[in-house]
Amino acid sequence: MAEYKNYTLNFGPVHPAAHGVLRLILELDGENVVRADPHVGLLHRGTEKLAEFKPYNQSIGYMDRLDYVSMMCNEHAYVMAIEKLLQLEVPERAKYIRVMFAEMTRILNHLLWVAACGIDLGAMTVFLYAFRVREDLFDCYEAVSGARMHAAYFRPGGVARDLPTQMPQYQKTRFTSKRKAKKLNEPRQGSMLDFLDHFVVDFEKSLDEIDTLLTDNRLWKQRTVDIGTVTAERAKELGFTGPMLRGSGVAWDLRKTQPYEVYHKLEFDIPIGANGDCYDRYLVRMAEMRESNKLIKQCVDWLRANPGSVLSDNHKVAPPKRNAMKNNMEELIHHFKLFSEGYCTTEGEVYVGTEHPKGEFGVYIKSDGANKPYRLKMRAPGFAHISAMDELLSGHMLADTPAIISTIDVVFGDVDR
């Protein structure tokens, strides 16, 4: 009798469902996955080592490029680690602005996730719906920083500047008619806070549309229910965090369990799943977007009623005012030295973890008292999830592989660093 051998298949790194540069070596028995061996490192750029050769305030831009779809959430952990090292006090208004943008970033991440997951599983309409909404939030990024993705808006001690009193306006182009531009600009006539008041109302309707398309869709449930199941105990043993852990029924969220910034003053719930499968992870992320929308609304209301400073008055980290630099040579010298040499910190080591859209994103800094870290280490949430790929895929069909990879929500900018 002929001997049967398992088939070895390379999945990725150039595959539309690989979500970046994931390379999986799959061992197949027919169409059943017997073993999955993930290979990482194809997007390694040496970010940690680069940051160890630059002053603290010159590495904020690197953080945006780690998980490049959750930009400000990466910045958030990094600047909080520096503040902990320097024992900096952050103005209350800056804390609310940070939380508001962190929740906007969570929505941006989850919208991209549901869009990409929809395409992977054959539901392309969701992609178009989600990207339409993402443009509104990118407008907010652009309004505060001038950049639509890599904002570098957070600073040790606060944020770069206060919220703008007007939003960017759409212009008539080859692709945007005058009538369409006028309609798009209607909610953008006031300040950013006015625009966000419109957004939180419209976003609920957009989520309802996605819910209608997917949640009770027979084909969607066939592709996700009982696929990639992980029990609560096993999820904890594997080091899962974020929606991967909460999808298995564990109510662990650093915003609640280890509150930072102003999360302890805000009201929100922690959505959890029951079965730990792909479908539960989808439901958790959809519910998280609704909770983030509530948090944005609470921040908008507080910010409207409480004007104030958005950056620490500690001159060690805060640049001088523009008017002062025009009239005072010492202020100009201080500005030059701050942005060329940076500032020295006390000796010591700190770790700060934040609730990133994909899980716990942590920054560890060891300082020897210089103006740059002696050692910078980052905890990428996706690395633990990728490490469990063999367990998640084994026993499933090859066609289930895109669904499982997609609901892990991995981006290799932070995994490979």
From Swiss-Prot:
GO molecular function: NAD binding; NADH:ubiquinone reductase (non-electrogenic) activity; quinone binding
Keyword annotations: Cell inner membrane, Cell membrane, Membrane, NAD, Quinone, Translocase, Transport, Ubiquinone
Entry GO terms, CC: plasma membrane
Superkingdom of source: Bacteria
Bilayer topology annotation: Peripheral membrane protein
Enzyme class: translocase
InterPro entries recorded: NADH_Q_OxRdtase_suD (IPR001135), NADH_UbQ_OxRdtase_49kDa_CS (IPR014029), NDH1_su_D/H (IPR022885), NiFe-Hase_large (IPR029014)
Disulfide bonding pattern of the chain: none
Localization annotation: Cell inner membrane
Reaction equation(s) it catalyzes: a quinone + NADH + 5 H(+)(in) = a quinol + NAD(+) + 4 H(+)(out)
EC number, as in UniProt: 7.1.1.-
Coiled coil: none
Pfam families, sorted: Complex1_49kDa
Similarity field: Belongs to the complex I 49 kDa subunit family.
The protein's assembly and partners: NDH-1 is composed of 14 different subunits. Subunits NuoB, C, D, E, F, and G constitute the peripheral sector of the complex.
Purpose of the protein: NDH-1 shuttles electrons from NADH, via FMN and iron-sulfur (Fe-S) centers, to quinones in the respiratory chain. The immediate electron acceptor for the enzyme in this species is believed to be ubiquinone. Couples the redox reaction to proton translocation (for every two electrons transferred, four hydrogen ions are translocated across the cytoplasmic membrane), and thus conserves the redox energy in a proton gradient.
NCBIfam families: NuoD, PRK06075.1
Identification of the protein by name: NADH-quinone oxidoreductase subunit D
Gene field: nuoD
